[in-house]
């Protein structure tokens, strides 16, 4: 059906269409319209506007055709044509900095191997404050509700805890013993592998879970937080049990150090979030990019500082043992969860989450403890290698499982 409009209506329509984009621009918003929408439609309904005559002049009459076909107008039929979106700001982009973390880990590893001086300035004295900053970021992005999530799925929390502080230490003891007995490596190397197995879960496991199964990210945070909070007692005790007969372990010193590096920063972040929400909201957008840079230094520096040991004849053997330890931990967490939650509706997602929790350790904490409480620098080599291996293996699984999920759906 066609309608003949008057010249006055034509002028009004043309002026309206000409002024509308300016009003949109001035409000700093972008309409979700294709570029040619203003020349093809009126404001009230999907209409096609064609001039009757191709002779120039403002007295041309225009025909308006009412149409129900949005596709020929260049619009998505299921979309809201008047939806408004904001232009992403620098702060918004900074909030998403964590999305490049896997690439940053790989890049810092390669850079540390190719040009070690790029990270050697980040000496061992910076490890403790760097790890403390990451813990502070965890605290400021959490609240008491995150910890209360533990009571909703106690069975999963218990299984994650068993994986962290029973399955993993047993694997660490086996591979640490094999390093000394079978591969004839120095005793401090075996002690370093055992130390890695005694620390709490890595915060990167929370992000890995978020990338593959966002719905279980809160559960992952609770499991990691509980293992981190209790590490103040469990890690020194396990270290004494597994390493004490081989090397002296300062239990009191470890407890004090974990309190300062882990518990205090998390508590500070929680308190700041609770008591001064405006301050925490102001600094929260900057934490992802700072955390990524912090993690890059924490991954590259241990590798660069121990480059001679890593590239030594027994460096490949240590790399093999650490890789096998993490691979065994990933597999143990995956299949143990599958046997316990085989009938759960989200069994596969639970398997992936518990696999991350068991396979990814806070190797930075192990490195900080090795640097501070063991005189032999060889103890720090397995944690340094573990930092890189654990990160690369974890995010490789993220890529594999994400692709698997997309193919399933």
Curated annotation (Swiss-Prot):
InterPro entries: BilAc:Na_symport/Acr3, Bilac:Na_transpt, Na+/solute_symporter_sf. Residues 1-49 form a transit peptide. Disulfide bonds: none annotated. The lineage of its organism: Eukaryota, Viridiplantae, Streptophyta, Embryophyta, Tracheophyta. Keywords: Chloroplast, Membrane, Plastid, Transit peptide, Transmembrane, Transmembrane helix, Transport. It is a multi-pass membrane protein. GO terms for molecular function: glycolate transmembrane transporter activity. It is found in: Membrane; Plastid, Chloroplast envelope. Its main location: membrane. This is Probable sodium/metabolite cotransporter BASS6, chloroplastic. Belongs to the bile acid:sodium symporter (BASS) (TC 2.A.28) family. GO terms for cellular component: chloroplast; chloroplast envelope; membrane. The keyword Protease does not apply. The chain crosses the membrane at residues 100-120, 121-141, 170-190, 191-211, 221-241, 253-273, 285-305, 316-336, 381-401. It comes from the Eukaryota. May function as sodium-coupled metabolite transporter across the chloroplast envelope. It comes from Arabidopsis thaliana (Mouse-ear cress).
């Amino acid at each position: 059906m066609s309608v003949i409009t008057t010249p006055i209506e034509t002028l009004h329509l043309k002026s309206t269409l000409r002024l509308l984009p300016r009003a949109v621009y001035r409000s700093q918003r972008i309409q979700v319209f294709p570029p040619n929408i203003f020349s093809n439609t009126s404001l009230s309904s999907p209409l096609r506007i064609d001039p009757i005559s191709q002779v120039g002049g403002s007295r041309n009459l225009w025909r308006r055709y009412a149409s129900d076909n949005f596709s020929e107008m260049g619009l998505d039929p299921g979309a809201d044509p008047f939806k408004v979106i904001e232009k992403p700001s620098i702060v918004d982009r900074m909030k998403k900095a964590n999305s490049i973390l896997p690439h940053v880990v790989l890049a810092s590893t390669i850079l540390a191997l190719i040009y070690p001086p790029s990270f050697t300035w980040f000496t061992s004295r910076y490890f403790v404050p760097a790890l403390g900053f990451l813990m502070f970021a965890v605290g400021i992005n959490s609240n008491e509700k995150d910890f209360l999530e533990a009571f909703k799925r106690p069975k999963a929390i218990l299984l994650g805890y068993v994986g962290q502080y029973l399955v993993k230490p047993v694997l660490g003891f086996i591979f640490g013993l094999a390093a000394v007995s079978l591969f004839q490596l120095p005793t401090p190397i075996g002690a370093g592998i055992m130390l890695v197995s005694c620390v709490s879960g890595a915060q990167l496991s929370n992000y890995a879970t978020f990338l593959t199964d966002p719905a279980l990210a809160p559960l992952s945070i609770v499991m990691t937080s509980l293992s981190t909070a209790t590490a103040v007692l469990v890690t020194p005790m396990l270290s004494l049990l597994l390493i004490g007969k081989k090397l002296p372990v300062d239990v009191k010193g470890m407890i004090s150090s974990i309190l300062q590096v882990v518990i205090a920063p998390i508590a500070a972040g929680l308190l700041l979030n609770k008591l001064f929400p405006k301050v925490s909201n102001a600094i929260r957008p900057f934490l992802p990019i700072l955390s990524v840079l912090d993690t890059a230094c924490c991954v590259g520096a241990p590798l660069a500082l121990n480059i001679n040991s890593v590239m030594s004849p027994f460096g490949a053997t240590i790399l093999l043992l650490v890789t096998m330890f993490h691979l065994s931990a990933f597999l143990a967490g995956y299949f143990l969860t599958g046997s316990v939650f085989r009938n759960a509706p989200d069994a596969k997602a639970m398997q992936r989450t518990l696999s991350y929790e068991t396979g990814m350790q806070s190797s930075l904490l192990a490195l900080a403890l090795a640097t501070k409480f063991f005189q032999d620098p060889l103890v720090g080599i397995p944690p340094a290698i573990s930092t890189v291996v654990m990160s690369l293996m974890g995010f490789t699984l993220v890529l594999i499982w994400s692709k698997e999920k997309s193919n399933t759906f």
